[in-house]
């Protein structure tokens, strides 16, 4: 991986995950600048030898790569002073949810190489899944750098059409919360059966972890086969799945993901 000077605008959880992931891969700390108005966040990075600043314009001006790691609702405000900076020879990466490449180039008109990224919170433990999109103005070299950057905290996947970023949002960006809610419901059910909260959590989290590992380590088996392999006719698993199916579980999941996509599309028009 090339060691370009990268400036992070925003030092929140996702920026922290990426920066610390890069440092674990021996990326030079002095090649990273993090801009954030919060003194405690800056101190967190400074302890690792990372350069910090409160002057976004000065930091961005010297950077080769700029990563926007702020909430979509404040992106326009953050980008306003940055529009005076010449981005023509810089790689611009955005992890702001629902912000299109077209919108980014409208906010920063001189930007040529732009990569839109949809990461997810498992990046905080090095198990992220990030969807990436770049238009034809972004070189192969810039694409490779963006991919290497996000690979520091998990896996990456390029989509050919920006429209597919909405599906990526539903599939990985938001989906950790779906899994958490399912685990939460299972845990509460076990508590209602008399188990302690700790025991209930240990049972459900290990079941989820083991199931995910079975999926990863058996790529030759489709998901329905894995499910069927656990489900004996007339058994306990079948009884549980029958209840889920009676309540149209698959339809509920599809409706939830479609709602996520609809909101993602709506956000493109809001910010």
Residue positions per predicted region:
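Small-residue helix-packing motif on alpha-helices
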Residues: 32, 42, 59, 196-204, ...
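Short pre-catalytic strand/loop immediately N-terminal to key active-site residues, enriched for Gly-Thr
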Residues: 115, 164-170, 223-228
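Internal alpha-helical scaffold of NAD(P)-dependent oxidoreductase catalytic cores
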Residues: 103, 107-113, 129-167, 178-218, ...
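Rossmann-like NAD(P)(H) cofactor-binding subdomain of soluble oxidoreductases
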Residues: 33, 39, 48, 56-61, ...
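NAD(P)-dependent Rossmann-like dehydrogenase/reductase catalytic/cofactor-binding core
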Residues: 2, 205, 209-271
């Amino acid at each position: 991986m090339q060691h370009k000077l990268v400036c992070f605008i925003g030092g929140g959880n996702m920026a922290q995950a990426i920066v610390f992931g890069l440092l674990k891969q021996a990326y030079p700390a002095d090649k990273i600048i993090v801009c954030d108005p919060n003194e405690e966040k800056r101190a967190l990075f400074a302890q690792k030898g990372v350069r910090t600043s409160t002057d976004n314009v000065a930091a961005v001006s010297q950077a080769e790569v700029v990563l926007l790691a702020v909430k979509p609702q404040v992106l326009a405000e953050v980008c306003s002073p940055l529009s005076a900076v010449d981005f023509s020879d810089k790689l611009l990466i955005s992890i702001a949810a629902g912000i299109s490449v077209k919108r980014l180039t409208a906010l920063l008109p001189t930007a040529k190489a732009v990569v839109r990224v949809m990461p997810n919170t498992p990046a905080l433990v090095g198990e992220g899944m990030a969807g990436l999109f770049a238009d034809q103005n972004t070189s192969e070299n810039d694409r490779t750098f963006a991919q290497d950057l996000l690979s520091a905290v998990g896996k990456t996947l390029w989509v050919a059409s920006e429209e597919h970023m909405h599906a990526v949002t539903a599939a990985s960006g938001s989906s950790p919360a779906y899994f958490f809610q399912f685990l939460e419901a299972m845990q509460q059910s076990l508590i209602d059966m008399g188990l302690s909260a700790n025991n209930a959590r240990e049972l459900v989290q290990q079941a989820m972890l083991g199931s995910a590992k079975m999926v990863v380590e058996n790529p030759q088996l489709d998901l329905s086969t894995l499910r069927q392999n656990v489900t004996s006719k007339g058994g306990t698993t079948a009884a549980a799945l029958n209840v889920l199916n009676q309540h149209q579980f698959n339809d509920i999941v599809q409706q939830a993901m479609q709602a996520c996509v609809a909101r993602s599309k709506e956000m493109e028009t809001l910010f």
